[in-house]
Amino acid sequence: GVRYSEAGEALEKFCAEFNIPFAETQSGKTACLSSDKYNLGGLGVTGNSAGNVMAKDADVVIGIGTRFSDFTTASKSLFKDDVKMVTINTSRFDAYKLDAVKMVADAKLGILALGDELRKANYKSAYTTEIADAKADWDKEMEILANYNYDENFKPLIAARDEKTIPEYVEKIGGVITQTAALAMIRKLIPADALCTGAAGSLP
């Protein structure tokens, strides 16, 4: 919804003004700068630790233009039991999900309207170092993953697995670079203004 509404800049300004972190769904990628101070990255089973840790501890979650899919919400297990949900969505059906306080509206207009109300209430979140800490922890993890290769020191991240799978995979591809290391390398090497198109038949 943020991408279709071209509301990326409005969302970034909203989050900066009220000290609110945000995470992205796969469909929402490119709507906001990944380098934005408040952008935690992905969310849910296809997300990262920064987005998921902050979402798990949140008292209020604002879903903007999202369908709250199982990937995004970790099959509805990501949030606290008593979390308060707020939705902004042009689809009334999706706005009503998770027993949310709903705003059936365009994402950009909804963000601006919500900002007006928060401004009247002199609202600012109570976060101090939590956002930066979560991002720093993820950066450390990403550095480990970026250097995670099929070498003599390789140890699988998931112990419960078929022991033949990884050796067979390495033999077939004929290389030592893991998917995460390859993606990290691409991210470092591509120009800042590059356009990327991707598709996958399974989890990354």
Q: What is each of the regions a protein language model found here?
A:
Residues 8-19, 76-81, 102, 119:
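Short, solvent-exposed amphipathic alpha-helical segments in soluble enzyme
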Residues 6-8, 33-34, 71-74, 97, ...:
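Short glycine-/acidic-enriched loop or helix-start segments at secondary-structure transitions
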Residues 1-58, 188-204:
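Anionic-ligand anchoring segments at beta-strand to alpha-helix junctions in alpha/beta enzyme folds, i.e.
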Residues 86-197:
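Phosphate/pyrophosphate-binding active-site segments
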Residues 44-96:
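Phosphate/diphosphate-binding loops
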Residues 1, 25-27, 66, 88-90, ...:
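Cofactor-binding loop segments of dinucleotide-utilizing enzymes, especially the Rossmann-like FAD-
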